[in-house]
Amino acid sequence: MDISRAEQRILHILAQGGCIQVEKDEDGRIAEISCVTRDGWHLPGLDLALFRKVKRKGAIASTNGGPYRITRRGLQLVRSQTDNR
């Protein structure tokens, strides 16, 4: 299964230890989404549509109401990239 460049970018950040933090409104609907790297930087470019696409593919999951992290399925989908650290 191919994934888009934007999905690839998000999954790569999550594979390195980042997370997706979700804030919900009073009705329980998602109000705000932010992707945070392992260093604490907020990554732009994550919108609700992209979040739903990645979640639908089973690449991310939340446990016990915590932030969304990459799953084993997500690790299989993500292609390795060189990291300039």
Curated annotation (Swiss-Prot):
Coiled-coil residue windows: none
UniProt record similarity statement: Belongs to the UPF0386 family.
The protein, known as: UPF0386 protein Meso_1721
Taxonomic lineage: Bacteria, Pseudomonadati, Pseudomonadota, Alphaproteobacteria, Hyphomicrobiales
